Amino acid sequence: MSNHPKITSAHQNVEEKLRELQERFCHLQAARKEGRHGDLALLEAQISQNIREWQAELTAPSPESSLLGEGISQFLEEFAPLLKLDEEDDATSTLKEHAGAKPDPEGFSQSLCPPEWTSENFSQSPFNGNFSCGFEDALNSTETHGQQLHYGYEGFDPSINSAPDFHDQKLSSNLDITSQYDYIFSEVRQELDNSPSTKLDSSEEIDNFAEFSTPSSVRVPPSAFLGPKCALWDCTRPAQGSEWYLDYCSNYHGTLALNEDSPGTAPVLRPGGISLKDNLLIDALRAKTQGKNVGIPVCEGAVNTKCPWNAAELFHLELVEGETIREWLFFDKPRRAYDSGNRKQRSLPDYSGRGWHESRKQLMKEQEGQKRSYYMDPQPPGPFEWHLFEYQINESDACALYRLELKVGNGKKSPKGKISKDPLADLQKKMGQFKVASDKPSPPTKGRKE
């Protein structure tokens, strides 16, 4: 076995990067199954960044690459484009430039490595959910290779059982980024099958296979859901983090909560409405009062200093096609006009109407909180209707959670007061009752006898 310190360091670096990449893929798989589209976008960006950093390290000169000579440099130059995720279209990217007009599969695989390496096969298992990366000794080729490192990725899409044909398959230009990940990694596996392995040996024997299973944040026992939940406001998974993200289900959600409620952030926007029950919003408010980051920003005076339709920097009002409701979430200090249980109103300086008018107060005994509902009185001209919901908890009045709702109405806005459909009919009815009462014979009176 080689005791070269730089090779040992390189081996550990590769192991850590593979471990991190595998964990992010597990989170990506879980987010895809649970339909968390916001999480998918951020995870895809993180995976893309990790791969670009890895690509930069591969192409950077190092003592190990200089020892291996020009062969490995040529291999890395051919391998680096496979890690590029920012190509506009795979069908027109530089991946096809190596094949020529009529690509020959055998010739293409031979061009990736020197002739003296072509007889050596890269140890690779079928891509059925587990992939392995073999590292052999490049400096001491006569010594025996240690135990292979197997990195099993159980969370990967099992439908990918074989690599697509690199030369014949054509990708459409509207592939989503997750499909491009699957395709690119399948191509990498196919090219590594036809190329030599980079021989880097560890200085110590590995007792057990370094097999990765789905992280505990993806698979949890049912009893864990009865304990504390993830502090991210729209996540219902249990909090099973470690180190700095103890209050979250994963380090990804911890980072997401920290980024999305940072100062200066616009309110949380949800086209189509917020499909969460009120108890989860109360939980988010309670976690905020406990000093946790929940992914909802603080926006002081967002709906009290001016009308929401005049605050374009906070509330984006361009609805998408077919959208009938849009909601925003943010924290703010409770206003004095909302403290009383009586129905009150709060005027707005840029609106001639009465402003926000309280319509309902709901006590949430199980959650030890309350919810107040407001409507804009009167509603502004046009098809839009504005509603505001305020959530508070009994143990703290430091802040309140506000949910602002924009709803597309049917154009028929009726006043909130109860008005009779036909006032004339009511008047005639009352007059009829009075007439009947007046027609009744009066009791006889006794006259004085003369």
Swiss-Prot record:
Keyword Cytoplasm applies: yes
Stored InterPro entries: VOZ1/VOZ2
Effect ascribed to mutating C235A: Reduces DNA-binding ability
One GO molecular-function entry: sequence-specific DNA binding
Post-translational events: Phosphorylated.
Broad class of where this protein is predominantly found: cytoplasm
ZnF region ranges: C3H1-type: 230-253
Biased composition (Basic and acidic residues): 95-105, 355-371, 419-429
Induction trigger: By far-red light. Down-regulated by far-red light (at protein level).
Tissue specificity note: Ubiquitous. Expressed in the vascular bundles and mesophyll cells of various tissues. Expressed in the root, especially in the root tip. Also detected in stamen filaments, stipules and anthers.
Positions bound to Zn(2+): C230, C235, C249, H253
Phenotype caused by lack of the gene: No visible phenotype. Voz1 and voz2 double mutant displays a late flowering phenotype under long-day conditions.
Positions of the UniProt region annotated as Disordered: 91-115, 339-374, 411-450
Keywords from the named record: Activator, Cytoplasm, DNA-binding, Metal-binding, Nucleus, Phosphoprotein, Phytochrome signaling pathway, Transcription, Transcription regulation, Zinc, Zinc-finger
Location within or outside the cell: Cytoplasm; Nucleus
Subunit annotation: Homodimer. Interacts with phytochrome B (phyB).
Domain notes: The VOZ region includes a DNA-binding domain and a dimerization domain. Contains an atypical zinc-finger followed by a basic region structurally related to the NAC domain.
Name of the protein in its database record: Transcription factor VOZ2
High-level lineage: Eukaryota, Viridiplantae, Streptophyta, Embryophyta, Tracheophyta
